[in-house]
């Protein structure tokens, strides 16, 4: 992909670069951790790939979490698109991991067993146990969520679909259908929810989808909302395959 094509819009999906808790193999969810130096470098490279592909985002959508916001800022700077409008919304947040937030993934798997671990981590409609409001990793009284009538205490992927896809259809999709190039910088599970919608992936098969950090995934979408390149195109397919495999292997190493 070298040039933008006005016959269709482009939707660029970018998972945040490696975070501190990606590196330490902890469930993160809505906990607001920072990027590692590797994560910042991934964000730079992601932005460079966007520029090298001839893509020129006209607007950015991201979450309220630092790791996605920072990734977006770095990537846009590298792409020379640092000046475009930015929309931040909680509905692009990572899935809330409930009482698992802060726990090591490998230790959690050892404690509860492979089947329960994978059900919490990858099933479509099985949420982890809810987090207590007084837990240090809960979002109780977090000012960024002051306008929410209720802050989630846990979520499954279905919950993310229910909050994010209506927002996508109302706010983001019309721009893409109109021929714009839109960058969405978000999280593993909010992007899995969107890819499920775009590619019409079944509730069962979505368990096998993993999104690598820092590698842009581009969908071409026409004026009717039809995806012209099912599955999208990673701007670095080899690195994306390796990154997705690394995500799938989480839970192995402590």
UniProtKB/Swiss-Prot annotation:
Pathway: Carbohydrate degradation; glycolysis; pyruvate from D-glyceraldehyde 3-phosphate: step 3/5. InterPro entries: His_Pase_superF_clade-1, His_PPase_superfam, PG/BPGM_mutase_AS, Phosphogly_mut1. Substrate binds at residues 15-22, 28-29, 67, 94-97, 105, 121-122, 188-189. Its EC number is 5.4.2.11. CDD domains: HP_PGM_like (cd07067). The active site is at 16 (tele-phosphohistidine intermediate), 94 (proton donor/acceptor). It comes from the Bacteria. Keywords: Gluconeogenesis, Glycolysis, Isomerase. GO terms for molecular function: phosphoglycerate mutase activity. The keyword Isomerase applies. The record marks 187 as: Transition state stabilizer. It catalyses: (2R)-2-phosphoglycerate = (2R)-3-phosphoglycerate. The keyword Transmembrane helix does not apply. SUPFAM superfamilies: Phosphoglycerate mutase-like. GO terms for biological process: gluconeogenesis; glycolytic process. Catalyzes the interconversion of 2-phosphoglycerate and 3-phosphoglycerate. Belongs to the phosphoglycerate mutase family. BPG-dependent PGAM subfamily. This is 2,3-bisphosphoglycerate-dependent phosphoglycerate mutase. It comes from Corynebacterium jeikeium (strain K411). The gene is gpmA.
